Amino acid sequence: MERNLRKERVGVVSSNKMDKTITVAVKWKEKHPIYGKFVNKTKKYHAHDEKNECGIGDTVRIMETRPLSRTKRWRLTEIIERAK
């Protein structure tokens, strides 16, 4: 599989307490099938942060990768914006 075909997500770092691991919260809007209202959805991913460079509140891009642990299947590709 080519590297550019892997899934990518953009989200906000919600936790960096683990060593070389961050928790990224990804938000999106989804239309309710019956009522038609847009509902905010959130999903959390564990991602590999090799250099421990992310802080809480940073906006980051993560990419799908091979399983690195029981829950970790994503890795950090870039920090888009640092938290203020």
Swiss-Prot record:
PROSITE patterns: RIBOSOMAL_S17
Organism domain of life: Bacteria
GO molecular function, one term: rRNA binding
Keywords for this protein: Ribonucleoprotein, Ribosomal protein, RNA-binding, rRNA-binding
Gene Ontology BP annotations: translation
A cellular-component GO term for this protein: cytosolic small ribosomal subunit
Coiled-coil ranges (or none): none
Keyword Transmembrane: no
HAMAP family assigned to the protein according to its UniProt record, in alphabetical order: Ribosomal_uS17_B (MF_01345_B)
The family this protein is said to belong to: Belongs to the universal ribosomal protein uS17 family.
Protein function: One of the primary rRNA binding proteins, it binds specifically to the 5'-end of 16S ribosomal RNA.
Quaternary structure and interacting proteins, as annotated: Part of the 30S ribosomal subunit.
Protein name, entry field: Small ribosomal subunit protein uS17
Record gene name: rpsQ
